[in-house]
Amino acid sequence: MTQTLSQLEHSEAFIERHIGSSAQQQQQLLEAVGARSLNALIQQIVPADIQLPAPPPVGDAATEHQALAELKAIASQNQRYKSYIGMGYSAVLTPPVILRNMLENPGWYTAYTPYQPEVSQGRLEALLNFQTVTLDLTGLDLASASLLDEATAAAEAMALAKRASKLKDANRFFVADDVHPQTLDVVRTRAATFGFEVIVDKAEKVLELQGVFGVLLQQVGTTGELHDYSALLAELKNRKIGTSVAADIMALVLLTAPGKQGADVVFGSAQRFGVPMGYGGPHAAFFACRDEFKRSMPGRIIGVSRDAAGNTALRMAMQTREQHIRREKANSNICTSQVLLANIASLYAVYHGPQGLQRIAGRIHRLTDILAAGLQQAGLQLRHKTWFDTLTVEVKDKAAVLERALSFGINLRTDIHGAVGITLDEATSREDVQTLFALLAGDNHGLDIDALDAAVSKNSQSIPAGMLRKDPILTHPVFNSYHSETEMMRYMHRLERKDLALNQAMIPLGSCTMKLNAAAEMIPITWPEFSELHPFCPPEQAAGYKQMIGQLSQWLVQLTGYDAVCMQPNSGAQGEYAGLLAIRHYHESRNESGRHICLIPSSAHGTNPASAQMAGMSVVVVACDKNGNIDLHDLRVKAEQAGEELSCIMVTYPSTHGVYEETIREVCQIVHQFGGQVYLDGANMNAQVGITTPGYIGADVSHLNLHKTFCIPHGGGGPGMGPIGVKAHLAPFVPGHSVVQIDGVLTQQGAVSAAPFGSASILPISWMYIRMMGAEGLKQASQVAILNANYIATRLKDAYPVLYTGRDHRVAHECILDIRPLKEETGISEMDIAKRLIDYGFHAPTMSFPVAGTLMVEPTESESKVELDRFIDAMLAIRSEIDRVAKGEWPLEDNPLVNAPHIQAELVSDWQHAYSRELAVFPIAGVRENKYWPSVKRLDDVYGDRNLFCSCVPMSEYE
């Protein structure tokens, strides 16, 4: 054997696992596109003046086991204290059946947002269950399928209140003084960009004020007190002031629904329903409102509709409210929500059912009552007379109490003047309460749990009788049927089978980068060292997180060419918002607050104008030329017209048209010449990493979609992470946090997310990816992604024109197939092709974005030549089918394209089509061996929006 030990150790092994095609297959792909090597292909495609002389120095590759061992050593530096801090975060007991069959299951976590409902019925049903839980617990009419976190939901509630307000001159938003501080922080950030005045005071003080358009209350208050807001809500309604209540989802199991008390909007975090704290996230927020506000509601709504055969089917309803259609006029900027986390919470409710939830909530409340009674018996005073799970305990020597708590391995809430806060949770046991007695009342406290239980069970008044829930919850059969693990496992598998995820086939969605989410990358997110930490624990207890985040940040600095990275934004859209706020605050620091114009090319993703609007900027559209590139003349004219009002440009690179624009540096120079900043959208970073960087190109700030480029899975529509990279002059202006000090950030910068580091517990995924790939592997990933896109474009260009190409007729990492000529000639649309692909076993490419009547294909580096060929064969076969329609062999109203997708039930019913059953479901030979069967036919979108219904339907509807 002539190999060296170094070669046998094979530290680059993961690169071959991540990149789908072998070296031999890559050579075949290169021959097909007419390039000698990967480097030669890149030289043909990427402008020479932006190519890096060497890959960014992020180190060599490591094997999966080496990287896991390194990260485990880092994670072990985190100290797992018992955290009773509360403030919207609680320890949970995730049911193992959900952990194994959903959170650790690629059939759930690798799926995309359910824009194609025919291949998404399983997770749509789980999300509908989530909405039903929300409606039952809040007492309102309409619920969304999750928002990013509770604080973001509060900001959205404020925006809704203003949109819906009939008090057009009112400009003040009132926040009760017992709302969580991080929620207030995010509300203030959003209010500042909209020019709203935020007033914080005791709830009843709002009645003394004028010019208020909305009010935010909290149930349970941040220090534990319960409030009967019925009278206040009624009076505010009389005054036409919008009302929102931030609610604890577990408390709502026992308490009267705020909607029944008169609230217009109720929202909160669903974290307590089975999702670990994870040092701040990811967690799904729930959001509900009255029916009259449905057109103003933020976020996605799952609605009950019907398919082409008249059968009940689910879809995302009223999508015309979303930013990809309405752009800067959108209700919200919901590009990534928290589907995976919402579905965990949904299935937690299904598994426990109403009785199980009442038992859990009842146990938490009983233990809190016992703790309260014991502390009072020991001579300690409580600040409030009512509570669900949180006590504020008056202490004389607070510092001594907190020091003693740490010696017990316990974290208490520290920021209440003259007192400590204690929040109990699902994981709290009677032994934990005994430990708290010893901590606060001394080792010889003499308190007996059973005796205290007997006393409080008879005469507890901590929840006033008038605030106890009287109505039943979760009466639908889905919440009363799956309580054995066997039934629950089968229910989850039944849902999973309805969906198409990466474990079934390539998902070639343009602008989405659906690459491999490797098992080794996913393993650390469930380690208790990462999953159990409270986001507001003492920083020394999170030393492992600090090291991991620090290393990841430094790698991202190298890979982007920026000087600093902020990890707080918990979605790409939030990253855009945070980056634009940094630009805004930078201009303000230079006494140039008049710079408010944001230039955006006409090809931009809808999140760009929506983010600009959220950041308080005015959007001016820059034209593109016939080749899809930014029109430099128009850019120069618009920049000059804006003059001292020019704030920035938002540009995507490679462009949203799938091309490396040759003039990108000139674009940056023009904007800088007129005093603006350059925001380079990181959506297409998978075509930059290792080849160029935004900083090298000339940009000032970018967000990175870690759920695209850096392997965090899409989760069926979230979680995501959108950290921003910035040049040094913008670094002081990235988001801060009112509870946790973030190094290097000016303290006056507000937060954009509830937790200081966003969805911190999924950052290990990106850490693992970069560590295992190394500098050369990351560059190779970008090169192969570009190669794969050019292979598809080359093979399909004669059947489907490629709309935009760059030098030498090359594309970047994605290509746009123009269906418009075919539609004009034959009547077959991009929608028909997308739905027919389901019969061939594929998720559709991105439809009608960024150009109507097109399909945008992004294959990613993780797909093998075998899978690329399978997709190409499907597209060519579909083109042959279109030709048969054009020749008149099949009528336009009855052919396998317009009738797609086809379901099993059709095969055993009367068949009266002009084509065979076999052609319908097994159109080419390769489909037979791994057939995906959709559970519904094509959805009736018009019916779904005209008949909006967004909670569970009777089980008979599915029969």
Curated annotation (Swiss-Prot):
It catalyses: N(6)-[(R)-lipoyl]-L-lysyl-[glycine-cleavage complex H protein] + glycine + H(+) = N(6)-[(R)-S(8)-aminomethyldihydrolipoyl]-L-lysyl-[glycine-cleavage complex H protein] + CO2. One of its GO terms (cellular component) is glycine cleavage complex. Its EC number is 1.4.4.2. It is an enzyme of class 1 (oxidoreductase). Keywords: Oxidoreductase, Pyridoxal phosphate. GO terms for biological process: glycine decarboxylation via glycine cleavage system. GO terms for molecular function: glycine binding; glycine dehydrogenase (decarboxylating) activity; pyridoxal phosphate binding. Pfam families: GcvP2_C, GDC-P. The glycine cleavage system is composed of four proteins: P, T, L and H. The glycine cleavage system catalyzes the degradation of glycine. The P protein binds the alpha-amino group of glycine through its pyridoxal phosphate cofactor; CO(2) is released and the remaining methylamine moiety is then transferred to the lipoamide cofactor of the H protein. Belongs to the GcvP family. This is Glycine dehydrogenase (decarboxylating). The gene is gcvP.
